[in-house]
């Protein structure tokens, strides 16, 4: 079974997924890392944050290649983004050709208070993120819900929204494990 677990940057997805992987024994595959590896091999980017600034066509090509690799895996938690906010608008993180390749059983969206997400982003020196306000983060979380609903209609997978309350990643992880096991 393949599960797709998503959330906006700074929601605490990596922390929660580390716990989920440990508790479930299911490997986590980072979709963005696969895309980055392909883009870097092609000389298109030097760091992962540059991917979202590539042309739409290039991003689509990278999505296809990463989706095909994941589709070959028997059991995995796919760590990705439901939608990608670009200078041109929101790009589906899982367009039709990727949905077919991945064939997920469930989409889980991890959410948190937008003000907390902003604070986490502001305090993370390891990433070169665009400066977004609380309203923009809220909008992105809402867009993720819309994309998840559309993906579910197409794929038949269920959608689960999990709150990652401040200081309680274990609680969010436990809820996710119950859904994906």
UniProtKB/Swiss-Prot annotation:
Keyword Cytoplasm found: yes
Enzyme Commission number(s): 2.7.4.3
Any one GO molecular function term: adenylate kinase activity
GO cellular component: cytoplasm
Residues at which ATP binds: 7-15
A Pfam entry, by short name: AAA_17
Record's keyword terms, sorted: ATP-binding, Cytoplasm, Kinase, Nucleotide-binding, Transferase
Taxonomic superkingdom: Archaea
Family: Belongs to the archaeal adenylate kinase family.
Protein name, per record: Adenylate kinase
Record gene name: adkA
